[in-house]
């Protein structure tokens, strides 16, 4: 597999590199903005779970590029610096992080809070959906500390069977909640984005990160709050219909007959967790799984032998009572 294979399989990955974006997800935020005008009148924006920084790049151009705009990016992982973006390496579940955000805004609340974070998927869909829901609630919780009344909140969701619970929780705090699917988001993915506009918390609501919304105390956090009894959350497809299909493979031949040239990623990851494994593989030191058909008699004899069974069993146990 050559280094151009992903450019063929994922046109948005290729376009992101050609346009200087750190990740293909930049197109998702741009297409959401085309539909909802998220950046209109925004002077202070917060990007939660920001690494590697593609959404922060978009915010810095759309908000920070206005001269008076300010952008704060927050992530647990280190992120390469971006011009016009204030970076905080911190935990979004900590009150100190919320205070630091407000401090950078000189005591003023944010107009827009976005979160494109997602946990490492396990392949167990129920577990992945649950973990994503908890991450969204953590982002919502810190948003209640830093977002101004009437502000906007955009966060990634997984449209699982319990997504209606998330909608109802978000609807308590926002006058408008929609589910949006950008064109650059693969059709094969259950990923979508909750676009929440008009921040309007219940009367008497006091944000409290010491009792986060994700601690399962629904009786005190949600069930006692008054809100709509039945709301249908609209589903909106974002992006021009003529835009590229994120699930389609495109040719590398460019328009006008120009020759394709490979473009490296704009910003390689900083100290990724797989870096050590790549080094071991490159040096031929990475352990390989030994398949049964590859085992010879001699190689089997060299493998570590299990402990003698008499050291593990009561000597009174008869052989016919041992079930392996």
From Swiss-Prot:
Gene3D superfamilies, per the entry: Vaccinia Virus protein VP39
GO molecular function: S-adenosyl-L-methionine binding; tRNA (cytidine(32)/guanosine(34)-2'-O)-methyltransferase activity; tRNA (guanine) methyltransferase activity
Alphabetized InterPro entries for the sequence: RNA_methyltr_E_TRM7 (IPR028590), RNA_methyltr_RlmE (IPR050082), RNA_MeTrfase_FtsJ_dom (IPR002877), rRNA-MeTfrase_E (IPR015507), SAM-dependent_MTases_sf (IPR029063)
Region described as Required for binding to WDR6: spans on this chain: 221-240
Catalytic activity of the protein: cytidine(32)/guanosine(34) in tRNA + 2 S-adenosyl-L-methionine = 2'-O-methylcytidine(32)/2'-O-methylguanosine(34) in tRNA + 2 S-adenosyl-L-homocysteine + 2 H(+)
Knockout consequences: Leads to a reduction in the level of tRNA(Phe(GAA)) in the brain, but not in the liver, kidney or testis. The levels of tRNA(Leu(CAA)) and tRNA(Leu(UAA)) appear normal in the brain, liver, kidney and testis. Impairs long-term potentiation and long-term depression in the hippocampus. Causes immature spine formation in hippocampal and cortical neurons, with an increase in thin dendritic spines and in the striatal neurons, with an increase in the immature filopodia-like spines. Decreases length and width of the postsynaptic density (PSD) of hippocampal and cortical neurons.
Residues at the active site: 156 (proton acceptor)
Any one of the GO CC terms: cytosol
Transmembrane segments: none
EC number: 2.1.1.205
Residues given in the record as S-adenosyl-L-methionine binding sites: 53, 55, 75, 91, 116
Top enzyme class: transferase
Pfam families: FtsJ
Keywords: Cytoplasm, Methyltransferase, Nucleus, S-adenosyl-L-methionine, Transferase, tRNA processing
UniProt record, GO biological process: cytoplasmic translation; neurogenesis; wobble position ribose methylation
Subcellular location: Cytoplasm; Nucleus
Main location per the UniProt record: cytoplasm
Function field: Methylates the 2'-O-ribose of nucleotides at positions 32 and 34 of the tRNA anticodon loop of substrate tRNAs. Requisite for faithful cytoplasmic translation. Requires THADA for methylation of the cytidine at position 32 of the anticodon loop of substrate tRNAs. Requires WDR6 for methylation of the nucleotide at position 34 of the anticodon loop of substrate tRNAs. Promotes translation efficiency of the UUU codon. Plays a role in neurogenesis. Required for expression of genes involved in neurogenesis and mitochondrial translation and energy generation.
Similarity field: Belongs to the class I-like SAM-binding methyltransferase superfamily. RNA methyltransferase RlmE family. TRM7 subfamily.
Subunit structure: Interacts with WDR6; the interaction is direct, and required for 2'-O-methylation of position 34 in substrate tRNAs.
Protein name as catalogued: tRNA (cytidine(32)/guanosine(34)-2'-O)-methyltransferase
Organism of this sequence: Mus musculus
């Amino acid at each position: 597999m050559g280094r151009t294979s992903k450019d063929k399989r994922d046109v948005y990955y290729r376009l992101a590199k050609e346009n200087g974006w750190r990740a293909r997800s930049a197109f998702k935020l741009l297409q959401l903005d085309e539909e909802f005008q998220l950046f209109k009148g925004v002077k202070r924006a917060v990007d939660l779970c920001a690494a590697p920084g593609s959404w922060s790049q978009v915010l810095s151009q759309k908000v920070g590029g206005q001269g008076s705009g300010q952008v704060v990016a927050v992530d647990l992982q280190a992120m390469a610096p971006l011009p016009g973006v204030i970076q905080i390496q911190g935990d979004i579940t900590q009150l100190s992080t919320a205070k630091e955000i407000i401090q950078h805004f000189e005591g003023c609340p944010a107009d827009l809070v976005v979160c494109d974070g997602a946990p490492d998927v396990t392949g167990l869909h129920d577990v992945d959906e649950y973990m994503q829901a908890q991450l969204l609630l953590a982002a919502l919780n810190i948003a209640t500390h830093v977002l101004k009344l009437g502000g906007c909140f955009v966060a990634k969701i997984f449209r699982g069977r319990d997504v209606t619970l998330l909608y109802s929780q978000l609807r308590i705090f926002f006058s408008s909640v929609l589910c949006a699917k950008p064109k650059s988001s693969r059709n094969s993915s259950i990923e979508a984005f909750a676009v929440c506009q008009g921040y309007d918390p219940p009367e008497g609501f006091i944000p409290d990160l010491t009792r986060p919304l994700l601690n399962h105390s629904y009786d005190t956090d949600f069930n006692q709050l008054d809100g709509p009894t039945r709301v249908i959350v609209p589903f909106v497809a974002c992006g021009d219909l003529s835009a590229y299909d994120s699930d389609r493979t495109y040719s590398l031949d460019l328009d006008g007959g120009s020759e394709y040239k490979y473009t490296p990623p704009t910003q390689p990851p900083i100290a990724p967790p797989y870096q050590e494994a790549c080094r071991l593989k490159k040096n031929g030191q990475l352990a390989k799984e030994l398949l049964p058909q590859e085992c010879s008699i001699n190689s089997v004899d060299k493998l570590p032998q299990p402990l003698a069974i008499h050291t593990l069993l009561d000597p009174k146990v008869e052989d016919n009572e041992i079930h392996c």
